[in-house]
Each structure stands twice: as C-alpha cells, then as structure tokens.
C-alpha cells in the first residue's frame, strides 16, 4: 500500500469551492465590476528600478501639474510612523533615503482615474545613486 492511498480527507477527493459556480457562470462580481463611489481616487506606486541605491532627490512637480492629480506623496509626507511591518517595525511604507530592492516604493500618486495616476507616476523623477546589491 502506498502512502498516497492511506491519506484520507481532501487529497484525491473533489472539494467544492464556494465561489466556483459563480466564477464559471460569469455571475461573480469583481471590484472593477462595481460602480465607483463619488470622489474615488486611484493610487499608483512609484517603484525603484534598483536593487540597492541611495535616493538623492524626488521631483514631483511634473506629476502634480497634470490635471486630475490630487497628490504625490513621499516618505516625508507620512505623519507618524512610516512602517507597515506587523512585528519588527522595519518595513517602511515608502522608502526613506535608501531603496533595498527592485520595486521598493518611493512615492505614491493619487488621481481621479487610474490612467491619470499611471501617467503621473511616470512623471515622478527620482535621482538615485546606485549601490552594490545587498
């Protein structure tokens, strides 16, 4: 007798998925299917292209001058603690002075539409001093 044949429960057994029927029938409602609430803003992160670098400056003027952009925030704009780590308090919401991985968020753009937010995020100019990857 093999180990697999001795296993009881969900292994080798069909398990009903609660939302499967709605998914395959097209009845599922996803967030993009719902009407937007009045005043909704869309956020897009500006992320580091570097694995490790010092942030020398962040220029947001071009982004904030686009129509429909409500704000471009950096770590300097966060009141209180800039951290989302659940335990050790070492994960900033937005990078401060240094990025430590490709994709490390350095700014967030908030605009009236996702398209405007994406366009504005591309206009944020971050001056980096690349460092050796950690």
Predicted regions: what is each one?
Residues 1-134:
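Flexible, low-hydrophobicity surface segments
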């Amino acid at each position: 007798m093999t180990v697999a044949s001795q296993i009881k429960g969900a292994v080798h057994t069909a398990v009903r998925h609660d939302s499967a029927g709605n998914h395959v029938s097209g009845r599922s409602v996803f967030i993009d299917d719902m009407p937007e609430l009045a005043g909704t803003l869309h956020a897009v992160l500006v992320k580091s292209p570097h694995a490790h670098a010092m942030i020398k400056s962040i220029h947001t003027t071009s982004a904030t001058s686009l129509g429909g952009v409500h704000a471009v925030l950096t770590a300097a704009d966060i009141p209180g603690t800039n951290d989302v780590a659940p335990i050790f308090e070492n994960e900033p919401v937005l990078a401060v002075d240094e990025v430590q991985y490709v994709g490390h968020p350095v700014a967030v753009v908030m605009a009236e539409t996702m398209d405007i937010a994406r366009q504005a995020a591309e206009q944020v100019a971050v001056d980096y001093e690349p460092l050796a990857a950690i």
